[in-house]
Amino acid sequence: MSTTTLSPLRQRMIEDMNARKLCAGTQRGHISSCKRFAAFVKQSPDTATLEDIRRFQLHLAETGMSICNRNRIMTGVRFLLRVTLRRLDLSAEIYHLREPQKIPLVMSQDETRRLLAVAGSLKARLLLSLGYGCGLRAGEVVRLKVKHIDSAQKIIRIEQSKGRKDRNVMLSSKTLDLLRQWWKARPSWHDAGTPLEERWLFPGRGGGKPMTTRQLNRLFHEAADAAGIRKGVTLHALRHSFATHLLEDGTDIRFIQALLGHDKLDTTARYTRVATGMIAAIESPLDRLSQPRKRPRKSRKNPPPA
């Protein structure tokens, strides 16, 4: 896909995405997906055929890519075909794969404690504490600004996150203490001209932008390796662990739903499948077989009236 050929088409697609108020992350993903499709068919997407769509979907399947990523790529291609190019005949042939319902991978409280203890710097401890202590996504952590922190009420405001929704999350005393330490040590050479409330808590190297989620993921994996956690967890496991540990401690699932920003309670309810503390507290019916069966007490009948 040459820049000259793509430029007008890409501009039109961006305009269509802006008109529908798609967030920046979604737009980047859609553009990347369409570039991948164009590179595969070796031509501009506006000349694609039904056979091109079929071959591309087969190609993605043959690469061993996860169903989630295949769906994500084809969603971007579908947007281009259906919205920008008005090729409904082609977009209708893009199928959505049903994703297997996997149990979220979580860390135990001991593993989480070890992870935070071995974080190599104040910045790393704070970043990971925000992920676990507030149940934040990676993108939510790195995009925090001064204005989002309410130290008086111990609340962090998350603005326009997934699904373009705002929500409030808890701010623990330990995390607030780390935030205050970090603010004193945080590099400020790039803050000139930026109002205090708009300053990034974790600025990137170039200035003007926050640190990247890739940098945050690297810090997480370094800490996980140092803590001896070998079960393949990712940074998102901190969010899973936040929800699971709250559930095990008896927090109402509807409050957890609000803290995570889930639209549907069913999405939050999946953590009941990994709350090992709750599962272990339930007595198996097999163990009860050997116990003497309790007979129901007979109610004393009132004597008949004289």
Label every PLM stretch briefly.
Residues 1-306:
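Conserved catalytic core of the tyrosine transesterase superfamily
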